């Protein structure tokens, strides 16, 4: 049988490059699987499931395991897949002779344990489903019938999994608590602006070192990235298809960590704009503006493109961009370069070039700081979305389009390599707490703060300010 995957030990983009020769590709079929030039390109769901299941003399390629576990949830619930794996891996081959069954289980058990280890370590959130956990425990009992070592390995596997799920639950509770506290403490009207300017936790009073501030942003980014499960990328676009047969499964899940990460980007943008618009005096606003430009530069140097883009987005919001007198006191050369780096023209060509450079640096890194790559996340999601929209999940013959899912897995696996890096910077707890919980202005409050800082320039702006004052004073 041809190799199961176009990659050996990792996902290799060259597997998708076109050949320089003009020969016809070699097409082959094996039991419901279709190969082109020795690469799996499509197959029936049942054949792909069977390819996942180890036998005594076969174990699937790791990149195939990842790709199929990632994409299969578009076609069947993970619990259904687990049931099929249990049946095909153990129950299907029982012959009714206790001794022969015990020997076979003993022979296959290490590979079943290995497969379940990869599943629980890469997709632990699948096992928040009680049925999945129950199946895992049942498999432990089945393997114990033939092999004590495998039973112990399964017990250790379950213990590691439970620790991961406990940590996830604590993280989600912490996010919910922080969000609730920020909502309660949030200023509800601009009449409190003067008091907020003088608050002790004003950003420059708290931390006036752009490098340290960028480090703390990187801590938050990397922590939130680390909790995003790879399956969330599939779930994100699966929910957009009303005809999906497993919509009910996807909709049962809580708000995803992916969504929480996108919300963090929005929060940082609004926090940046709030801090710039808040000071009453022009020179103070200019200092804050310069500070955030320097923070953005440090984020770029670190490889934290998500915080960089969030800060630029905040600075480009109308309440900030219209402060011409404030901008006039700032040297914008550095800012202009950063804006160019994140310019959306030519499909973010400049940013993608910088990202490739950061990725290359990470692959040859000598220090943990050089390993950091935090992509502009909204664009990363957009790329996956267009990959999904541009290719069908199934071919006309009913086969699953596995070429599409190789490409999806390649993109998501790169994300996983970025996600696993440990942030090397020292934590500044006060700055971290400020970043995640400091009150921020709403869009209307920002606009009014901007008008109060630098007055309206025309009748339309004067009318807008009057309307905002009236509406916010009633809150």
UniProtKB/Swiss-Prot annotation:
Residues 209-456 form the Ras-GEF domain. This is Ras-GEF domain-containing family member 1B-B. Residues 1-25, 452-475 are annotated as: Disordered. Residues 1-19 have a biased composition (Polar residues). GO terms for biological process: Ras protein signal transduction. The lineage of its organism: Eukaryota, Metazoa, Chordata, Craniata, Vertebrata. It comes from Danio rerio. Guanine nucleotide exchange factor (GEF) for Ras family proteins. It comes from the Eukaryota. SUPFAM superfamilies: Ras GEF. Residues 36-166 form the N-terminal Ras-GEF domain. One of its GO terms (molecular function) is guanyl-nucleotide exchange factor activity.
């Amino acid at each position: 049988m041809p190799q199961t995957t176009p990659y050996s030990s990792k996902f290799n983009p060259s597997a998708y490059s076109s050949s320089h020769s003009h020969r016809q590709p070699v097409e082959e079929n094996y039991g419901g699987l279709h190969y082109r030039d020795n690469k799996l390109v499509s197959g029936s769901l049942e054949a792909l499931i069977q390819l996942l299941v180890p036998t005594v003399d076969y174990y699937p390629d790791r990149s195939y395991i990842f790709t199929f576990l990632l994409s299969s949830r578009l076609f069947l619930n993970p619990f259904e897949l687990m049931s099929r794996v249990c049946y095909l891996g153990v129950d299907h081959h029982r012959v009714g002779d206790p001794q022969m069954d015990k020997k076979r289980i003993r022979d296959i058990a290490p590979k079943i344990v290995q497969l379940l280890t990869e599943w629980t370590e890469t997709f632990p959130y699948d096992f928040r489903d009680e049925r999945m956990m129950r199946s895992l425990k049942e498999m432990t009992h089945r393997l114990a019938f033939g092999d004590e070592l495998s039973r112990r390995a399964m017990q250790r596997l379950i213990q590691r999994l439970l620790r991961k799920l406990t940590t996830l639950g604590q993280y989600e509770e912490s996010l919910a608590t922080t969000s609730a506290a920020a909502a309660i403490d949030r200023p509800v009207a601009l009449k409190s602006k003067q008091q907020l300017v003088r608050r002790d936790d004003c950003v420059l009073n708290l931390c006036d070192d752009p490098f340290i501030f960028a480090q703390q942003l990187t801590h938050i980014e990397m922590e939130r990235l680390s909790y995003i499960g790879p399956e969330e990328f599939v779930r994100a676009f699966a929910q957009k298809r009303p005809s999906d047969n497993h919509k009910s499964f996807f909709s049962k899940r809580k708000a995803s960590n992916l969504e929480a990460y996108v919300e963090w980007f929005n929060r940082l943008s609004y926090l940046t704009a709030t801090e710039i618009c808040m000071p009453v005096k022009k020179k103070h606003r200019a200092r804050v503006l310069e500070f955030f430009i320097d923070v953005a530069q440090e984020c770029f140097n670190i490889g934290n493109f998500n915080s960089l883009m969030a800060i630029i987005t905040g600075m480009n919001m109308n309440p900030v961009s219209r402060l011409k007198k404030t901008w006039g006191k700032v040297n914008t050369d550095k800012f202009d370069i950063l804006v160019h780096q994140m310019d959306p023209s030519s499909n973010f060509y400049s940013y993608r070039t910088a990202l490739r450079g950061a990725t290359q640096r990470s692959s040859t890194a000598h220090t943990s700081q050089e390993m950091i790559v935090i992509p502009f996340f909204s664009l990363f999601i957009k790329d996956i979305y267009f990959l999904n929209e541009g290719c069908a999940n199934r071919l006309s013959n009913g086969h699953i389009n596995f070429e599409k899912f190789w490409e999806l897995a390649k993109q998501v696996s790169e994300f996983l390599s970025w996600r696993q890096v440990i942030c090397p910077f020292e934590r500044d707890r006060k700055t971290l707490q400020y970043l995640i919980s400091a009150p921020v202005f709403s869009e209307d409050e920002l606009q009014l703060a901007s008008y109060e800082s630098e007055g309206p320039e025309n009748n339309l702006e004067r009318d807008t300010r009057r309307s905002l004052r009236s509406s916010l004073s009633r809150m």
